[in-house]
A protein has these predicted regions:
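Long, contiguous binding/interaction regions
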Residues: 1-162
């Protein structure tokens, strides 16, 4: 058994997930598609909780008549747990995900909390971005009031827990 297979088995035995993620990528030039794809793969490789990742960029196509170049990226990722894989998917939006191993996923309560927290934070960030881009000054004021009220409620809850 090779080192990678041994690492994969050990990681999966302790809650890890081996998955294939598929992404599309577009840019003005063929070279830029390749550079962006390489940078993207490198970014995933260095994310906390990624045990290893191996990516492949398909040959870019297109570019005719002022059209962008396009390619696909296949990225095999060994994540230390399901929450890490979930966070990668939420942050990077693959167009498809295939879990290769294990055949069944069991979440610890801590892992479920981590995943739900990441989902909530990601959704809140998207909502904030969209609302600040589309809202007028009056709507932004109401949004800021709501955020302050939520923060105050959070402070009250934290005080009760102490």
């Amino acid at each position: 058994m090779g080192d990678i297979e041994k690492l994969t088995r050990e990681t999966i035995a302790s809650g890890g997930i081996l998955a294939m993620l598929y992404f599309d990528i577009h840019a003005k030039t063929k070279e830029l598609v390749q550079e962006l794809g390489t940078g993207f793969i490198n970014e995933i490789i260095h994310k906390q909780g990624v045990v290893f990742a191996l990516g492949e960029i398909d040959e870019p196509t297109g570019g005719a008549e002022d059209k962008n170049w396009s390619s696909s990226i296949q990225l095999k990722v060994l994540a230390k747990d399901f929450a890490v894989l979930g966070a990668i998917c939420m942050a990077n939006s693959p167009y498809s995900v295939e879990i290769l191993r294990p055949d069944e996923i069991k979440l610890t309560l801590a892992n479920a909390h981590s995943l739900l927290g990441t989902m909530s934070a990601t959704t809140a960030e998207y909502k904030r971005y969209i609302l600040t881009k589309l809202s007028n000054k009056e709507e932004l004021g109401r949004l800021q009031e709501n955020l302050k009220r939520r923060a105050d409620m959070g402070k009250d809850i934290l005080k009760k827990d102490k």
